[in-house]
Amino acid sequence: MKEAIVITSGKGGVGKTTTTANIGTYLAMKGYKVALVDTDIGLRNLDVVMGLENRIVYDIVDVVEGQCRLKQALIRDKRFDTLYLLPAAQTRDKTAVTPEQMRKLIQDLKEEFDYILVDCPAGIEQGFKNAIAGADRAIVVTTPEVAAVRDADRIIGLLEAAELHNPLLVINRIKMDMVKRGDMMDIEDIIDILAIDLLGVIPDDENIIISTNKGEPIVLDEKSLASQAYRNLVERFLDRNVPLINLDVGNGFMDRLRRLFKMA
Amino acid sequence: MDLFKAFGGKSNSKDIAKERLQLLLVHDRIDTSPRFLEMIKEDILNVISNYVDIDEKGLRVEITKERKSDDTFISALHANIPIKKMKQVIR
């Protein structure tokens, strides 16, 4: 039952940190004990997305170097008392932690938590190797763009080589209107290319920027479509029989006409 | 004929994206230079042409990913070799 999941992508800026924050927050809302681990040493951001940046005293490097105990470095979330963040160090670099230390850290966290979500840095170097060490499963985040899908494919190959089999895919920032126009790759196109199982699809939604501005993960705001999509993603993570959320809410004249002709 | 393509002004740049990706990944996945597939191509050509006349221009060799019956994925080397005619001598 205790599981460590690494959230990775290869390419930067596709939404790893936002995905980590939202999956973790919703798991905690559902009552699970969750630890979020930021492994992006030198460029930490999970603290900001969670709105916990002012509470950092110790970080992941302090823990592995024995400067403090694990419990001292874990920051409890403002909203949910089963949700904790282990922040990355901001003034060190990726070599400050080794894969062996990560494995040990994850083992220690498993004694306290049901789920350990590891936010991976962009790239395929040391930071990536650290982040995947000790993980039981991987979630690969991509956007419907050539560069992001290409990097996702590369990451999938590297995960396989590291014996992290059957990673789950998250397609982020899909724009259904562009998909309809034929100007954005659809879910099927991406699955076709990457050939891995789909965990969830998150629509491009301004509300994500608004919630990030405030340091509040969007799953807290029930109304937005992105929030519903993240909730659906987590439900599917817990039970793969849950159907994928329908993001295609368009009901204009053309939409109905297309459906009539079975083109959409 | 897609009526909506004609009247709706669909530009379908996603098809271009998909096609570019598929080609790109052929090389990325084998993790070697594009020369690797060329070398395989040449060797296949040399062996096969002892037996059949093949259309060299139509020869395509690529690495693909396929879902197996147990739902795991494997990489496969696909060679599409158009035959012009069988060589009489060998048969």
Swiss-Prot record, chain B:
Database matches in Pfam families: MinE
Gene encoding the protein: minE
Protein name: Cell division topological specificity factor
Keywords, in A-Z order: Cell cycle, Cell division
Family stated for the protein in its record: Belongs to the MinE family.
Protein task: Prevents the cell division inhibition by proteins MinC and MinD at internal division sites while permitting inhibition at polar sites. This ensures cell division at the proper site by restricting the formation of a division septum at the midpoint of the long axis of the cell.
Entry's Gene Ontology BP terms: cell division; regulation of division septum assembly
NCBIfam families: minE, PRK00296.1
